[in-house]
């Protein structure tokens, strides 16, 4: 028995030594495509860093991030936990062949502040302002969640937001719920699919009194059939089939101007270079940027629409550009000047606060809605 115990210890030590040697022999990686983030590097040593604990903490992060076959171990861990009956993985629910992000209870003070900021923006604006809150899959597909799984009541919040702000609303919850049986959200990502964005665009056009779009007007293109989104990365669940990204709107008909680098430059409706990387959703408009303008030369009535938005609008804006001369998109995470002043300067008379519920609850940049002075 003692010999068997010693043998087990020796084998385990050899295994650890082998892993350490493997780790030392492998070059460090700068980035994880699977997790879509920068990986920790070997920390700088100094006696001061050792004394204050930052070097030790840095070493822990370094070994955790640079561990050999990290992605395989992460996936194996998630698979083992699933076999033990676990259904929530790092804030993500496994619902059959679909991953759905849990929406936690918000910071109530921040939530109320955001609603107040939007209300003041609506009161100060010289144009029309609408509120469009996009429910996540956890609300529209709540029947798919594990039994008893907690998730924030987004429907109640959307109704409360309409009452608190006093703004006319876009019924995105109703539009998406009506089509809940269709693939309106990605299975491995938190965004809506292009089909979901199409239904969202029609809900917005309906609220604005514009002619609705017809699905038959578009010919979807399968831009990618191997999209593994943010929930794939966050959860460690790597065994589901990848998603398909579709482009519906022709990129030949619209002119795109971007301020991605901080200055005006030609943009793209679809930046296909992203399709070669993990973050394929950023192929819509080229991803995050402070300001982007879509122009449709075929619409000659001078109509302009402003979207104060998050990344959900990247796949929605091309649809709206079918009914407006110009669609302006402002992302307050990067655009830190007055939106009210921008509206006045550009002669825009209609704006929509178009946010996913999760992002709206946590946003700390709505202060930039107000006019200067």
Where are the regions a protein language model picked out?
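Extracellular glycan-modifying ectodomains
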Residues: 1-373
């Amino acid at each position: 028995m003692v010999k068997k115990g010693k043998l087990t210890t020796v084998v385990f030590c050899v295994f650890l030594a082998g892993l350490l040697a493997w780790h030392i022999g492998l070059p460090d990686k700068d980035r994880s495509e699977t997790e879509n983030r920068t990986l920790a590097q070997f920390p700088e040593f100094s006696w001061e860093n050792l004394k204050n604990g930052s070097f030790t903490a840095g070493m822990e992060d370094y070994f955790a991030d640079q561990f050999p076959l990290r992605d395989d171990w992460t996936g194996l861990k998630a698979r083992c936990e699933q076999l033990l009956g676990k259904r929530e993985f790092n804030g993500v629910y496994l619902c059959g062949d679909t991953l759905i992000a849990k929406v936690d209870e918000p910071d109530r003070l921040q939530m109320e502040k955001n609603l107040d900021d939007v209300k003041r923006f609506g009161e100060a604006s010289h144009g029309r302002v609408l509120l469009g809150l996009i429910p996540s899959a956890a609300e529209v597909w709540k029947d798919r969640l594990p039994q008893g799984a907690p998730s924030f009541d987004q429907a109640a919040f959307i109704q409360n937001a309409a009452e608190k702000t006093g703004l006319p609303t876009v019924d995105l919850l109703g539009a998406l719920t009506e089509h809940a049986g269709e693939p309106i959200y990605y299975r491995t990502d938190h965004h809506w699919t292009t089909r979901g964005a199409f239904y969202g665009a029609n809900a917005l056009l309906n609220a604005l009194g514009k002619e609705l779009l017809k699905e038959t007007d578009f010919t979807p293109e399968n831009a990618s059939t191997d999209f593994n989104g943010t929930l794939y990365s966050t959860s460690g669940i790597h065994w589901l089939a990848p998603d398909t990204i579709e482009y519906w709107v022709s990129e030949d008909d619209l002119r795109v101007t971007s301020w991605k680098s901080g200055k005006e430059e030609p943009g793209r409706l679809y930046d296909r270079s992203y399709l070669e990387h993990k973050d394929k959703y950023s192929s819509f408009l080229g991803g995050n940027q402070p300001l982007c303008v879509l122009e449709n030369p075929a619409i000659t009535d001078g109509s302009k629409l402003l979207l104060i938005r998050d990344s959900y609008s990247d796949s929605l804006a091309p649809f709206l550009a079918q009914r407006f001369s110009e669609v302006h998109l402002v992302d307050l995470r990067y655009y830190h000047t007055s939106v009210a002043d921008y509206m006045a300067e550009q002669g825009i008379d209609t704006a929509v606060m178009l946010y996913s519920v999760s992002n709206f609850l946590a946003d700390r940049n709505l202060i930039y809605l107000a006019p200067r002075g």
